[in-house]
From Swiss-Prot:
Residue ranges of the region described as Disordered: 1-23, 42-90
SMART domains reported in the protein's UniProt record: Cyt-b5 (SM01117)
MF GO annotations: heme binding; metal ion binding
Compositional bias segments (type: Basic and acidic residues): 1-10, 47-58
InterPro entries per the UniProt record, alphabetical: Cyt_B5-like_heme/steroid-bd (IPR001199), Cyt_B5-like_heme/steroid_sf (IPR036400), Cyt_B5_heme-BS (IPR018506), Cytochrome_b5/Flavoprotein_Rdt (IPR051872)
Annotated protein name in UniProt: Cytochrome b5 domain-containing protein RLF
A GO BP annotation: lateral root formation
Cytochrome b5 heme-binding domain span: 126-202
One GO cellular component, as annotated: cytosol
Database matches in PROSITE patterns: CYTOCHROME_B5_1, CYTOCHROME_B5_2
Keywords linked to the UniProt accession: Cytoplasm, Growth regulation, Heme, Iron, Metal-binding
Length: 211
């Protein structure tokens, strides 16, 4: 038996059809190659992201893998928006809520209708009042304070004060000008407490008492 023909292997080159060669050449010619380092920098090393599903593409007899980077960009943008620090809200100063019937409009109505808010009982509101007398009026319906050289009975205004009664009590029986200017420098006290005017501070006696 002749076995020489079984071991004789002959290889011959088989050329693809001309049409397939032309298509393959045109498809390969349209592929653009870019620098790998620049691609990694621009895409944030997206090729290392295993979560992106690869796609198999075939051009003629040439097959290769394509990775979609658009989803990775969306995820990075969404994550950056998620971790943005929220802007701080400005801190506002809270006011003490007034009781019904004690708004500033209610106070304005009262000053127009009440005959004697200062409690003068017929006395003049232009008389000179020493500081010693101011200190004696600290309770009840007669609470005096000095504002910009004038003496006022602020007892009727207590419940109308936007800052509360406790804050206004700090000025009772003393000169409250500094405290008033600290919080209400823009307020015209001559108009606000016009009907509460008791008199004018006698600053001559105050100066004599100073060392």
């Amino acid at each position: 038996m002749d076995t020489s023909r079984d071991d004789d292997f002959t290889f011959s080159k088989v050329s693809p059809p001309d049409s397939e060669v032309k298509d393959l050449a045109s498809d390969v010619g349209s592929i653009t190659l870019k620098d790998g380092l620049d691609q990694q920098k621009s895409n944030g090393l997206i090729w290392k992201d295993k979560s992106l599903p690869p796609k198999e593409e075939t051009i003629g007899s040439l097959s290769f893998t394509v990775t979609d980077s658009s989803s990775s960009k969306k995820q990075s943008n969404e994550s950056s928006e998620t971790f943005k620090t929220p802007a701080r809200k400005p801190i506002t100063r809270t006011k003490v809520p007034f009781e019904k019937g004690y708004s500033q409009m209610d106070w304005l109505k009262l000053t127009r209708t009440h005959p004697d808010l200062a409690g003068l009982k017929g006395e003049s509101n232009k008389r000179l009042i020493p500081m010693d007398e101011v200190k004696k009026h600290r309770t009840g319906d007669s609470m005096w304070t000095v504002l910009k050289g004038r003496v006022y009975n602020i007892s009727p205004y207590m419940n109308f004060h936007p800052g509360g009664v406790d804050m206004l009590m700090k000025a009772v029986g003393r000169d409250g000008t500094l405290l008033f200017n600290k919080y209400h420098a823009w307020v015209n006290v001559d108009i606000l407490l016009e009907k509460c005017l008791v008199g004018v501070l006698d600053d001559t006696k105050v100066k004599k008492q100073e060392p």
